[in-house]
Amino acid sequence: MHAKSLTELRAALAAKECSAVELAQLYLKRIDAARDLNAFVHVDADLTLAQAKAADAELARGAGGALTGLPIAHKDVFVTRGWRSTAGSKMLANYESPFDATVVARLQAAGMVTLGKTNMDEFAMGSSNENSAFGAVKNPWDTNAVPGGSSGGSSAAVAARLAPAATGTDTGGSIRQPASFAGVTGIKPTYGRVSRYGMIAFASSLDQGGPMAQSASDCALLLNAMSGFDERDSTSLEREDEDFTRHLGQPWAAGNDAGKPLAGLRIGLPNEYFGDGLADDVRASIDAALKAYEALGATLVPVSLPKTELSIPVYYVIAPAEASSNLSRFDGVRFGHRAAQYGDLLDMYKKSRAEGFGPEVKRRILVGAYVLSHGYYDAYYLQAQKIRRIIAQDFQEAFKSCDVIMGPASPTVAWDLGAKGDDPVQMYLADIYTLSVSLAGLPGMSVPCGFGAGANAKRPVGLQIIGNYFNEARMLQVADAFQRATDWHKQVPAGV
């Protein structure tokens, strides 16, 4: 039962093959048995089972919706009433929110049962989930490897079938890269599609929540519940609600032959995504996936995203600048850890932040404060914003000749734990294919498409699919067609 997808579990609940309480108990038992992965930072069985009992009561009355009784885990960046909400930081080690994030509230309103809070890089700053105050997360496929970050706890939980689905957030690739490393499906929606209210902020012009699950169809179900306008989030976009499942299983164009359902689909391949730095084993898996798309009737079209390399310096100016502002609220007075011994008020600020923040967070706060300082604001921050606009324009130019863009989610498979901890630049380079999508505010997703080679043969590869603004339903259709033709998304780690 634990290996079933959300769609399959929904059918099992409807057929009364199991109850919501039995499902919750099953996953809680698995979470407890897999503590060594360190995927979860807070579990409360009593709270979970109370929600499951309420879901069973709804189902018994013939009420409830598509997600009622289905379990989900939440990344610990979403504040969740009753559970600790720490953002992976000592600064918030024992913080409990008096309210739920909109994402959490909407999924609970849809009847989903919260299994617990997943581990993450501190304040979502990292690509390996080694920056957490609660310890590193291990990749279920190879426990010597990282699971990706910053949503590494969520990706590991779904991969190990400790939860059928989880929420994540993506600022520069933090859903897509860990989904790639852990062999699960994850989608970052268009910026503003999912409410940021109650999501502990890193970089406000980039942060976006999204689902992680076994398949594109599961992600579509979750996105139906998660998305929508929220007046409490000033970046939330007013658009009519839509059904993200509506194109699943449908041909790209009416009248397409059953054997060529994607005839007419134009897939853009950026030259910049297939050059130096892309590992051979990742390239081989991506090429095989593209051939599968051709077999389904799609056409491959060369495109160019000439500012791809600039996305790294642009991101690491803008994101730290916004982080330095957002994290100024954690001062030991209003929120978070307070030093036990200090002299005056200023000394308390300094010691509380020095003790509460980890090295990577401190590094980014310092960088952000520097680029916003007098004399550097114009030279760095404003210049980065100008290039960001050009990056977005490059995508629009590419979409004139294609419907979706594809390439690797990451230049390599997951690396060993500790391999890049002393070299932040190498860590930053791991997000080269995802950063530009975030800077442009576009939707993107990663779907499993193979494995590495040699010593990396157990480490998954993810195919990145990028859509134009608000084109998630079509993007999910394209991913779903691939998953109907292949079984990479059904593969599980040994012992699972």
UniProtKB/Swiss-Prot annotation:
Mind telling me which Pfam families this protein's record contains? Amidase
Q: What class of enzyme is it?
A: ligase
- Record-linked PROSITE patterns: AMIDASES (PS00571)
**What is one GO cellular-component annotation here?**
glutamyl-tRNA(Gln) amidotransferase complex
Q: Which family does it belong to?
A: Belongs to the amidase family. GatA subfamily.
Subunit arrangement?
Answer: Heterotrimer of A, B and C subunits.
Name this protein carries in UniProt: Glutamyl-tRNA(Gln) amidotransferase subunit A
Q: Which organism does this sequence originate in? A: Burkholderia ambifaria (strain MC40-6)
Classification from the root reads: Bacteria, Pseudomonadati, Pseudomonadota, Betaproteobacteria, Burkholderiales
